[in-house]
C-alpha cells in the first residue's frame, strides 16, 4: 500500500492519477477537504481509503497505521506564501512531516517528501 498525503491538492492528485495509470489502486489518501476544489481533484481517481489529516496523524501517533505501507509520498503541507500563522505552519508543516518521517524510518518504509517554491520565497532575496 502507498500513502499519499495532500492527495486532494493539485500535485498530490496528479501523483494519485499517475499511480492509477501504472496500475496502483492500493493507495491510502490523506488530506483535509477544506474547500470545494479538493474533492473535485479526486474525481475518477482510484484509492482504497481516505483519512482526514487529523485522523491519519492520530493513527500514526497511536501505532495503528498498518505496517503494510511500502511508501509514504508526503505532499501534505501548507504552501501559502501569505499565511502568517507561525503555530499553524509549525504544526502542519514541521511537526506533521517529522512525525511521518520518524514513523517511516522506524518501520523501514520509503518516505518521499516534496516541497514547493513557497519554501524559498519569491526570489527577492537571492
Question: What do the predicted segments below correspond to?
Answer:
Residues 2-22:
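N-terminal Rossmann NAD(P)H-binding glycine-rich loop of SDR-like oxidoreductase domains
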Residues 13-15, 20, 38-39, 83-85, ...:
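Short glycine-/acidic-enriched loop or helix-start segments at secondary-structure transitions
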Residues 28-56:
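Glycine-rich phosphate-binding loop and adjoining beta1-alpha1-beta2 segment
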Residues 71-74, 99-126:
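Conserved Rossmann-fold NAD(P)-dependent oxidoreductase catalytic core, especially the SDR/UDP-sugar
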Residues 94-98:
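Conserved active-site region of classical short-chain dehydrogenase/reductase
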Residues 32, 77, 116:
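Active-site loop/turn elements of alpha/beta-hydrolase fold enzymes
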Residues 44, 53-54, 58-92, 121-122:
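NAD(P)H-binding glycine-rich loop region in Rossmannoid oxidoreductase-like domains
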Residues 1, 25-27, 110:
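Residues at the starts of beta-strands that form the adenosine-phosphate
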Amino acid at each position: 500500500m502507498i500513502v499519499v498525503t495532500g492527495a486532494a491538492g493539485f500535485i498530490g492528485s496528479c501523483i494519485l492519477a499517475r499511480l492509477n495509470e501504472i496500475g496502483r489502486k492500493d493507495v491510502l489518501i490523506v488530506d483535509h477537504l477544506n474547500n470545494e476544489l479538493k474533492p473535485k481533484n479526486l474525481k475518477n481517481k482510484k484509492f482504497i481509503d481516505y483519512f482526514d489529516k487529523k485522523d491519519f496523524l492520530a493513527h500514526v501517533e497511536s501505532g495503528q497505521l498498518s505496517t503494510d505501507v511500502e511508501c509514504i509520498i508526503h505532499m501534505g503541507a501548507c504552501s501559502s506564501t501569505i499565511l502568517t500563522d507561525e503555530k499553524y505552519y509549525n504544526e502542519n508543516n514541521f511537526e506533521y512531516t517529522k512525525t511521518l518521517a520518524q514513523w517511516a524510518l522506524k518501520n523501514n518504509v520509503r518516505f518521499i517528501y516534496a516541497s514547493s517554491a513557497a519554501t524559498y520565497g519569491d526570489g527577492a532575496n537571492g
